Design a protein with these regions (language model features):
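Gly/Ser/Thr-rich phosphate-binding loop
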Residues: 52, 79-83, 93-153, 165
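Residue-level recognition of short loop/turn positions
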Residues: 170-172, 181, 226-227
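Active-site glycine-centered loops adjacent to acidic/histidine catalytic or metal-binding residues
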Residues: 112, 136, 158, 220, ...
């Protein structure tokens, strides 16, 4: 069943890492994250860290998503930074983008679901945008991401975000070697990371399941390559997401 995630007021400060280091928002410029208001990324992807860093926020909202309508809205708003789920990028490559100029976008990123490398390369070819993929949760700020100071590996979640001590653990709490699949876990026994939630409200069973061995277990699995990049595998629970939407439970 869905869980209520309780944050304290310091969580908004954790989103500075999201905005400044991953999304690369700039003071007095416009950032645009394309997401629905029912998704946690609406808050951590376009409001908290972005406003703290001094950026204005551009928005495109409609009952039904149309790629060309969004592009035309972006041409009016002219955001310097842009973020969207993978499905939107997949929609974009199906359109004739030759008549549009995307040069005003200085930095583009993605979260919500993995992006296949073929779409990454096609977006770069058609628009000039290189997409910096990241991974976060309702429970946190961005946890893993591709950053401007490291080489992008298309399809990878990237590397740990500043402020988080992240490990891949097996079911016994032992660290996984490179190439092995494990649960993405955040160390909490040496201090509570700014940006991480405090608890699942009135849900002791969820807390007991998620906090073990001195770590918070995200419920997501991945493997790590020899260069320290993480690659998404799946969920440990029954959460189903498609096109950035939570379908079940």
């Amino acid at each position: 069943m869905p869980k209520m995630v309780r944050h304290d007021f310091s969580s908004a400060l954790g989103q500075i890492t999201t905005a400044r280091y991953w999304q690369c928002v700039k003071e007095n410029k416009i950032h645009m994250t394309q997401t629905d208001s029912g998704w946690a990324k609406f808050a951590w992807g376009k409001i908290y860290g972005q406003w703290i860093c001094g950026a204005a926020v551009g928005a495109y909202d409609t009952e039904k998503f149309h790629p060309i309508d969004m592009i035309e809205a972006m041409e009016r708003i002219r955001p310097s930074t842009f973020c969207a789920p993978a499905t939107i990028y997949r929609f974009l490559i199906k359109e004739d983008l030759s008549k549009y100029d995307f040069s005003y976008i200085e930095h583009a990123c993605l979260a919500g679901e993995p992006l296949n490398p073929e779409v990454f390369h096609q977006i770069e070819k058609l628009t000039g945008m290189r997409i910096y993929e990241g991974f976060g949760q309702s429970e946190s700020s961005v946890l893993l991401a591709n950053y401007p100071w490291v080489e992008i590996k298309p399809g990878s979640m990237g590397k740990p975000a500043p402020g988080y001590d992240i490990a891949l653990l097996d079911e016994n709490g032992e660290e996984c070697e490179d190439g092995m699949v494990g649960s993405i876990c955040i160390r909490v026994d040496q201090g509570h990371p700014t940006g991480l939630f405090r608890d699942y409200w009135k849900d002791d069973a969820a807390m007991e399941k998620s906090f073990k061995f001195g770590y918070y277990n995200t419920g997501d699995t991945a493997w790590r390559d020899g260069d320290g990049y993480y690659w998404f595998v799946g969920r440990n629970d029954d959460v189903i997401k498609c096109s950035g939407y939570r379908i079940g439970p």
